[in-house]
Amino acid sequence: MNKDFLIKAQDLSFERSGRIIFSSLSLNLEEGQIIIIKGKNGSGKTSLLRCLAGFTPITSGKILWFDNEILPAFYSDKPLIAWLSHLDAIKGSLTVKENLLFFAKMWSVEPSIFNECIKKLSFEKFMNFPASWLSAGEKRRLSLLRISFCPAKVWILDEPSTFLDNDNREILIDIMNIHLKNKGAILCATHDNLKMLNSIEITL
């Protein structure tokens, strides 16, 4: 019996300015699974994630998202894929609460779930602060908070533990494992040794 893969990549190759970044790469992502992508700086981890997220065209190969060659919309009321870049997508002129409510309303997140995520990441005291006041670590936690209540089945995370201290890295791991237990799936590029459920590691 064939498995239903959330993302299926076959024989991917990617070149930039005549340089081969990666080639002949295949992977299958299924429910409850995390694929961890490792490699030195410049090895192509971010490029691979951007290709798998549909932001950057591959040079050759084939990608299926939910058994379809058409990429699902990211910014919709029912997203299938959530993206977390190594750069935090935060509007500094808005408060922390306004940044979060923009997505919570779009995704019709239940207030109880929204408040639970805020509490888990200890963000209650920051809610009325302008987002521009946050430190690098706090901005990272804000981005993780947004991901944590996103209803998307697949999370694509680029260096999610950047700027996090040990306590918040443990919270990150907990959030990711809960997503996997709830039949979600994760593609993650990281330098850290994350203790994850049902993980597969790819080194570029």
What do the PLM-derived regions correspond to, one by one?
Residues 111-127:
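Conserved ABC ATPase "signature" region
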Residues 61-77:
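Conserved ABC transporter NBD signature motif
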Residues 155-159, 164:
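Catalytic Walker B motif of ABC-type/P-loop ATPase nucleotide-binding domains
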Residues 87, 92-108:
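Q-loop/switch helix immediately C-terminal to the Walker
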